A protein has these predicted regions:
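Extracellular low-complexity, Gly/Ser/Thr-rich intrinsically disordered linkers
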Residues: 255-299, 304, 309-315, 386-441
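Bulky hydrophobic/aromatic packing residues
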Residues: 44, 54, 58, 159, ...
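The canonical Cys-X-X-Cys-His
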Residues: 47, 69-81, 184, 290, ...
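Extracytoplasmic redox metalloprotein regions
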Residues: 19-43, 50-287, 291
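Long, well-ordered mid-to-C-terminal structural blocks that present hydrophobic/aromatic surfaces
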Residues: 290-350
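Gly/Gly-Pro-rich "capping" loops immediately C-terminal to redox-active cysteine motifs
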Residues: 65-71, 75, 85-107, 183-187, ...
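A generic secondary-structure signal for well-formed alpha-helical elements
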Residues: 51-58, 78-85, 188-192, 294-301, ...
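Bacterial Sec-dependent N-terminal signal peptides
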Residues: 1-18, 22
Length: 441
């Protein structure tokens, strides 16, 4: 276990209260909080196994993959409970086929889904079945300069889909947006946050001198309307365990009992190969264990808090007004969070946490290189140019855990500097303040 450079905790170093863990290693995202004991420890380990298990197309336990799919396990995209490198970047952005670590959402230009595809394009399929399509990408690169003359690049992706399983869709009628997985750090703490505190932040998130005004994304799921916290656009009320199994892997469950390719020729091909579609691929109890696993992961403590460079960086973080959106401190509600079956995790309640996010929607601009971070994709109340403030806890360990430093929703930023320089709209003022800093700062 790598314990180097772990400081004695104080102040903001305790990222998640009693769920804070003191690890600086490749398993820093994938380790349970200390309060997981007894029967919950057994369930945590079962959920961990199900999260990483490679699904097969066979009937029965561990099966149900496909017939078409985007990933073969939760861990194939959320490696070590983190985020995998965008595959197409890994191959130089040359248009390489396959995006096992990327999800592509497609629709018509008017927002309607394509009848034969649904909302997610599945580029992989089991033997004997044709994938729905293949994605390729090119990058428009533009060079900019800091005041001291040092240059940086911003790379705007352009996506093309070919090899449609059915009739080709004309580019002028097609809209697509790409995602790489989010880190699963602090999921339980996020679900336990008192929503009234988020609404209070929205009410006071009005800083006209910096152009900042955040708002909640109100979502209705399972007949309940509330403040969305989960997802790039805060478009979900829970961790979407059932949706992930169904939409990403084709694994049917009690909430999504139909195959994702229902109505396509692929489902008939699967039947001819002896696959059964009349039973669910994963039990509700197993999904609840995956949910427990995700909500029980610890959050790495802040590191090197006494390092002079870290202290200077924190000072500049506030001077650049990053904290107006990346809010330092929030609180969890007294009862903790809730699992899929309604069971509460009271250990997550009554905690002071430091996610560095307000979990609100903010306009991230539409003018950098022509489009900024506007993907034209609407999620609930979130418009195309609006994104949830990304929590920053654990972000400094991403390279150690996942082996890369790609950031933003589609991985276009190759490091944190590029991620900051992509900020437009409500992030424009902070970006410009950052740009004026010296290299040391």
């Amino acid at each position: 276990m790598d314990m180097d450079k772990i400081d004695v905790p104080n102040g903001y170093a305790l990222s998640a209260g009693t769920s804070t863990i003191f690890l600086n290693s490749s398993v820093a995202y994938d380790t349970n909080a200390d309060w997981i004991t007894g029967a919950n420890s057994i369930r945590f380990n079962n959920g961990d196994g199900l999260y990483d298990d490679v699904r097969t197309s066979n009937n029965g336990d561990g099966g149900g993959l496909g017939p078409v799919y985007a990933g073969y396990s939760c861990g194939s995209c959320h490696r070590n409970a983190g985020r995998t490198k965008p595959t197409l970047w890994e191959n130089g952005g040359s248009g390489n086929y396959g995006f096992s670590s990327m999800l592509v959402y497609i629709s018509r230009r008017n927002g309607a889904f394509f009848r034969d595809y649904g909302r997610v394009l599945h580029d992989q399929a089991i033997y004997g079945v044709k994938p729905e399509g293949k994605l390729s990408v090119t990058y428009d690169k533009q060079t900019f300069s800091f005041p001291d003359g040092e240059t940086y690049e911003l790379c705007k992706p352009n996506y093309t889909i070919t090899e449609w399983y059915k009739d080709s869709i004309a580019p002028e009628d097609l809209f697509c947006t790409v995602r790489i997985p989010l880190r699963h750090v602090g999921m339980g703490q996020m679900m336990a946050i008192d929503r009234r505190e988020i609404e209070a932040l929205a009410a006071k998130s009005n800083y006209p001198e910096y152009g900042i005004s955040g708002r909640c994304n109100y979502i209705t799921e399972k007949g309940v309307t509330g403040v969305g916290l989960s997802g790039n656009k805060a478009q979900h009320l829970d961790l979407t365990v059932e949706l992930g199994f169904s939409s990403d892997m084709g694994v049917t469950n009690s909430r999504y009992p139909e195959e994702i390719c229902e109505g396509q020729a692929q489902i008939n091909q699967g039947s001819m190969m002896g696959l059964s579609y009349d039973q669910l691929d994963i039990s509700t109890a197993d999904m609840e264990d995956v949910d427990l696993y995700m909500q029980s992961l610890g959050v790495p403590a802040r590191r090197n808090i006494n390092d002079p460079q870290v202290i200077l960086g924190e000072q500049k973080f506030y001077e650049a007004k990053c904290h107006l959106c990346h809010v330092t401190t929030l609180h969890t509600q007294a009862g903790g969070s809730t699992l899929l079956n309604g069971t509460r995790l009271p250990w997550l309640g009554g905690q002071t946490i430091h996610p560095y996010s307000d979990f609100l929607l903010h306009d991230m601009g539409s003018e950098i290189m022509g489009v900024g971070l506007n993907d034209n994709y609407v999620s609930g109340l979130a418009r195309g140019n609006e994104w949830r403030t990304t929590p920053l806890w654990g972000i400094g360990l991403q390279e150690k855990v996942n082996g890369h430093t790609y950031f933003l929703h589609d991985g276009r930023a190759r490091n944190l500097t590029e991620a900051i320089m992509w900020h437009g709209g409500e992030g424009e003022a902070s970006k410009n303040l950052f740009k004026q800093m010296s290299k040391e700062e």
